Amino acid sequence: MGKLIKLITTLTVLVSLLQYCCEFNSGSISCERTQTLCHYTNPRVWNTYFSRNCELYKNKVSPGFDIVARKYDTAVKPVIDDATVKVNKAAIQPAFKVIHSQCKKWNCGKYYQLVRSPMVKTRRFFFAKYNAFVKPNLDKFFTAEFRSHLKERILKYKNIGHYYFTITSRCIKSKYDFTVGNTEEKLMGKFKNKDTHGIHGSVTREPSSEDMVLTVSTMESDEEELTTTSTQTVVETITLDQEEASAVANHAHDDEASTDVEGSTDVNVNEQALLQEDFDMWSETILQKTQDVIQLFEKDVSKYINGKLVEEANHFKAKFQSLDDKSKKFFSKISLAINDIECVEGIDSETGKKIFFDKSGSTEISQYITRELVREYFNETRSTLDELTNAMEKDLSEITDEIEKKVNAIREENVEVFEEWGDIIVNEWSKRMAYVDVINAHMGADDDTTLDEEKAKSSVNWKKFLKGKKQIIESRDKLAHHSADLSRVNAFRQKVQKKILSFTQESGEFLYILRSKANLQFQERERKERERKEREKAAAEEFQRQQELLRQQEEEDEEDVSYTSTSTITTTTTMTL
């Protein structure tokens, strides 16, 4: 609630200040949007509008609004007007006198020279850049005739632009003096005099054909126009007297003459000075070009490596997935064989051959699981996984070699571009220096001292040229040996190798566990087989012992029968005798 009250208070203050400014400057506001803003933020306008369209507002609110408006006009507004007059007399007018006295001393010519000096330096800088980068390419596409014609047109428009720039600066100064004088009269006169808002001087008013009618659409009434405000566009025509016109013409003539003099001395004086200044920028240009080529090389390498690594990452992801699937398949095969080590032997009722079932005895297995068979499974798994991981490492090495070859190709391409640029730059600079030497030889001064100075400058310039040429060669060697950033490639390689090593260790550990489990199963089966054989052997020995006992018993029985028969025969014989 407090924030809402602050917002309402702020809006009220802003609207009040706006309305005061609108009322104070009601005769000098020419902007249609400002008039519209003043109109639609005026409380009196809205009071009239709501009074016409709402009976409740007309009867309940409008009388109170009229009372507040009258109190504002009688009690508040006079106080504000007096305070404004005092502030104007005590602060604004003295400050304006000081500012106006300083502004009267303003000289367009000095400021023109002040602005022209950095513009000349900028022109020289762009001229050097143009000769270094743009001109060699333009010479390939445009003929000498076309360039000569274009140069004439540019020189013509340059003189025209210089003339109009001078005229414009004069007009701006005249406009400034006129505006400042008008404002001074307004501030120094009566504080609020609506008759002093006219435009003084040689000014012609031409009303525009467009008038803006500000209306507020009604809700239920047929009256659409609430307030109509007409605006006019003032067209200012500045008329110069004969003296001012002749002064402008003379100044323009002097500018044209100075332009001709500058044009005639550019080759003889400025070209030599410009050449000496440009040698300092040439070194910076070579360094900048070297940095640009290196940045372009690094950008191309980074772009290629990013795309290549994304592509290869997807390929290796598929390879690791295939490796994982195959390893699971082999591990499942070995685990199933280990579970079938403890099998049950049976006899086929049809063929009479031995058949084997799992330990539950419900599922027939394809073959009897032996140590040799399980060992073969382990060897097959180990060899297959080793082949797959070795193939992945080989692919990784090939990818690294491919990236290095591509990076070297990109480097060679950028080196060739820099060499071509360097050849063009050296050629253009040699032509330019030879041209300056020829011009100095034919247009130089007759004074021997000046001639010696020109020769010394030429010698220094040629030494600087040789230094710049060596700098280009050194920059070329620097670019040729600039190492590319392969940290992401190395990180990718280490990541893949680490993953391969991790898979190899995990698969080896799992195979070791399976091998141990298989050994335990085989040992258990062999123990049971030994026990079974011992039981069978014991049973066989017991059976043999029983057979031996039975045989002995039979022999004893046979002996008893033989004795009885002998006794009977003896008795019979005796009785017969």
Curated annotation (Swiss-Prot):
Organismal lineage: Eukaryota, Fungi, Dikarya, Ascomycota, Saccharomycotina
Function recorded in the entry: Involved in spore wall assembly. May be a component of the mitochondrial RNase MRP (MtMRP), a ribonucleoprotein endoribonuclease involved in the cleaving RNA transcripts to generate primers for DNA replication in mitochondria.
Assembly behavior: Component of the mitochondria-localized RNase mitochondrial RNA-processing (RNase MRP) composed of one single RNA encoded by the NME1 gene and at least 31 proteins. Absent in the nucleus-localized RNase MRP (NuMRP).
Biased composition (Basic and acidic residues): 525-545
Gene: SHE10
GO biological process entries: sporulation resulting in formation of a cellular spore
Protein location: Mitochondrion
GO cellular component: mitochondrion; ribonucleoprotein complex
Residue span of region Disordered: 525-577
Name of this protein: Outer spore wall assembly protein SHE10
Chain segments annotated as coiled-coil in the UniProt record: 379-416, 513-561
